């Protein structure tokens, strides 16, 4: 898509939060340098539905509500595990209330707010920008400080997962008694879909809210001595993905690596947008969390519903978001059980995203706290699940919901 200089000026003029651009700087904004052809990317909009597009065409598709994988570098994701994939098995009910409920009391919405205020202070967290690199470096340093403050730095560790672009993904590992792994994820990047490299993208809800929600769940989880000392049956990981907005690029890279390494991933939950409830309330509906039911593992999703009922003050609603709608899709494509919980029914989700207006003022930290409760409850319950015994027992709750 080519943008005339006049159109570019109009976009910038209406973007009140954009940084100041002088006339000569606007003249230097070129979508394609003279004499060069735009780079093309292979995207997948549905299983088997692929096409080559330019980066500008990617953003145009996103502005029109289309989601996709950018499979340029990961055409074979899932090919290995497709031959070995087994049916997932999850507990019939929650069983660790005596351990989880005391931890829930330590969740602190003021911590979520404080961290989100900092996270949204970066001009953008666009994955190809220096701001995106800086925000990722801040997040990694924050995670390291949480680990150190908890006295967990002998066993728990955080590492960047570098990419070919500026912003690294982040992986935190809490070793357990086995290498079987439970993953909690969110994406750390933000985007302004008009001019990603220039315009502000605070990304408070998308996905600053999810990133800081799981950060608070992680901080609170480290208060468990059993978790920190490695007594959980399974290893636990927290992921903050880069480049979700570009076509699930960061999560594809990670799960492609895990697939090649033969990693045993028992469950992956994505938290993408956890703070917006106003459209739900305006529609006369009760506050709730949205449990995605399409392109997810039904057994894991069924257990998450039980976790919400057990540990949250708000109910859940079933909703759908389509193909490749967040990073859980990368885990699923790699052959791992994945699920996604969003802030509301999808039709009532935040309509300020991907713009300068995705700011904290629209968000509910009480609602984020409910997502944190669900996250903490799930990761603790599954962290201490003996999946080997469960599979031998033949206790399957993976039937169609």
Swiss-Prot record:
Disulfide bonding pattern of the chain: 321-325
Cofactors demanded by this protein: Zn(2+)
GO biological process: proteolysis
Prodomain positions: 19-87
UniProt-annotated location(s): Secreted
GO molecular function, one term: metal ion binding
Residue sites binding Zn(2+) 2 per the record: 206, 245, 354
Entry similarity comment: Belongs to the peptidase M28 family. M28E subfamily.
Primary role: Extracellular aminopeptidase that allows assimilation of proteinaceous substrates.
Name this protein carries in UniProt: Leucine aminopeptidase 1
Taxonomic source organism: Colletotrichum graminicola (strain M1.001 / M2 / FGSC 10212) (Maize anthracnose fungus)
């Amino acid at each position: 898509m080519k943008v005339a200089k006049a159109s570019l000026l109009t976009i910038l003029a209406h973007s009140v939060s954009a940084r100041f651009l002088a006339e000569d700087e606007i003249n230097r904004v070129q979508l394609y340098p003279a004499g060069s052809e735009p780079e093309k990317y292979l995207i997948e909009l549905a299983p088997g539905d692929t096409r080559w597009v330019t980066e500008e065409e990617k953003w145009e598709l996103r502005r029109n509500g289309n989601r996709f994988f950018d499979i340029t570098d990961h055409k074979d994701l899932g090919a290995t595990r497709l031959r070995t994939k087994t049916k997932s098995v999850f507990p019939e009910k929650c069983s660790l209330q005596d351990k989880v409920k005391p931890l829930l009391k330590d969740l602190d919405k003021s911590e979520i707010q404080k961290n989100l205020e900092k996270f949204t202070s970066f001009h953008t967290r666009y994955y190809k920008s220096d701001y995106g690199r800086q925000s990722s470096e801040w997040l990694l340093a924050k995670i390291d400080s949480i680990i150190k403050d908890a006295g967990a730095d002998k066993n728990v560790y955080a590492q960047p997962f570098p990419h070919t672009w500026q912003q690294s993904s982040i992986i935190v590992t809490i070793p357990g008694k086995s290498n079987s792994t439970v993953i909690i994820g969110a994406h750390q990047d933000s985007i302004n879909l008009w001019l990603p490299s220039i315009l502000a993208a605070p990304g408070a809800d998308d996905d600053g809210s999810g990133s800081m929600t799981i950060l608070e769940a992680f901080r609170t989880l480290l208060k468990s001595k059993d978790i920190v000392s490695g007594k959980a049956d399974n290893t636990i990981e927290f992921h903050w993905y880069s480049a979700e907005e570009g076509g699930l690029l960061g999560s594809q890279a990670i799960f492609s690596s895990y697939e090649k390494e033969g990693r045993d991933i028992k469950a992956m939950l994505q938290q993408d947008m956890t703070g917006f409830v106003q459209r739900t309330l305006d529609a006369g509906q009760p506050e709730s969390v949205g449990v995605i039911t399409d392109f997810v593992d039904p057994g894991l999703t069924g257990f998450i519903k039980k976790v919400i009922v057990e540990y949250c003050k708000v109910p859940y609603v079933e909703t759908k978001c389509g193909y490749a709608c967040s990073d859980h899709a990368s885990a699923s494509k790699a052959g791992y059980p994945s699920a996604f919980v969003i802030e509301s029914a999808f039709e009532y989700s935040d309509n300020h995203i991907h713009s300068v207006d995705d700011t904290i003022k629209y968000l509910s930290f009480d609602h984020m706290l409910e997502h944190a409760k669900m996250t903490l409850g799930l990761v603790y319950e599954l962290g201490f699940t003996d999946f080997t015994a469960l599979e031998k027992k033949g206790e399957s709750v993976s039937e169609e919901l």
